[in-house]
Every structure is written in C-alpha cells, then in structure tokens.
Regions:
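Histone-fold recognition with a strong bias for associated Lys/Arg-rich disordered tails
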Residues: 1-161
Length: 161
C-alpha cells in the first residue's frame, strides 16, 4: 500500500469513527476534517495547528456551528436535555455528499495520483465554499483564504509526504 493510500485509509476510518460518534449515518466533510486534525505529525495536521486548529479546536468550532445553525431557526441546544447521539449501526457509515465532494476536490487538485499528498485531502475539504466546514471556520475566526494558501504552500514544499 502506498503512503497516500495508507493515509487515505486511516483518515477515512477515523472519519467513520467520528461520524458514528456523532450519530451520523454518513461520513461528511466535517468528519474528514476532524480525522485530518487527529493525524499527529502529518503535514495537514501541522498546517491546521499553525492556524490554531488542533483536534479540540476543530471539534469546538463544529459545535459552535451546530449551535449557531440551531439558533438561526430559534432553537437552543441548552434549552433541551438532549441525549447523546446513538451509534447508527455496526455497519460502517457510507461517504456522504460533502465527504465525496471533498475527496473529489482532493483528487482533482493533484495532476496524477502519484502526485497526491495528504495535504491535498485537507485542500479538498477546505475548498468548499458552502456547508458546515466553511461556516465552522468562519465562526471560529479562521481566515479560510490564508489557511488555503498555507495548505498550497505545504503541497508546493512537500516533495515526499
């Protein structure tokens, strides 16, 4: 298994765990972002950390986005005693629409599969213009354009990883 295949496998398996932990039947872009942030010592994790986005910060940003989205329709999570999400099933979650789009953007950002690097996965996630991830980053005060530039710089300077 090539290094990129191993990285993709690890990220997708971790994203599946995140999706199940949140009670989601599908792996979405936010689960991929959490999985990338959890991969200590990798180029994408270092780029996120350089922007103040370690795993816990990404998780907090996604929680804020959830609360903000609920408040947009006049609902407060604090007003209800909600149970923890249940694990949907033993079957691994499928990759959902935003997860597929993020991976498609990642693959499209490299000229050939042999040129694909872990940072391309992060690039594919961050290139979304709408959705949970860009809303969460905006609420966290992250300059998405700057973060995208950092990822592109990491790709340009990364001949091996």
């Amino acid at each position: 298994m090539s290094p990129i295949d191993a990285y993709l496998h690890t990220v997708i398996m971790e994203a599946a765990t995140e999706a199940r932990r949140q009670g989601s039947a599908t792996i979405e872009a936010q689960h991929l972002l959490l999985a990338v942030a959890a991969q200590e010592g990798t180029a994408p994790q270092r780029v996120l950390a350089s922007a103040g986005l370690d795993y816990q910060a990404v998780l907090a940003a996604l929680d804020r986005e959830f609360d903000h989205s609920l408040s947009a329709v006049g609902v407060s999570r604090a007003a209800f005693n909600l149970p923890r999400p249940s694990m949907p099933s033993k079957r691994p979650p499928d990759i959902g629409a935003t997860g597929k789009l993020a991976l498609e953007r990642a693959f499209a950002s490299a000229p050939r599969k042999k040129d694909l690097r872990p940072a391309h996965v992060l690039l594919g996630i961050l290139q979304a213009e709408v959705g949970t991830v860009p809303r969460a980053l905006a609420l966290a005060g992250v300059d998405r354009a700057d973060l995208l530039n950092r990822v592109r710089d990491a790709i340009a300077g990364d001949g091996v990883e």
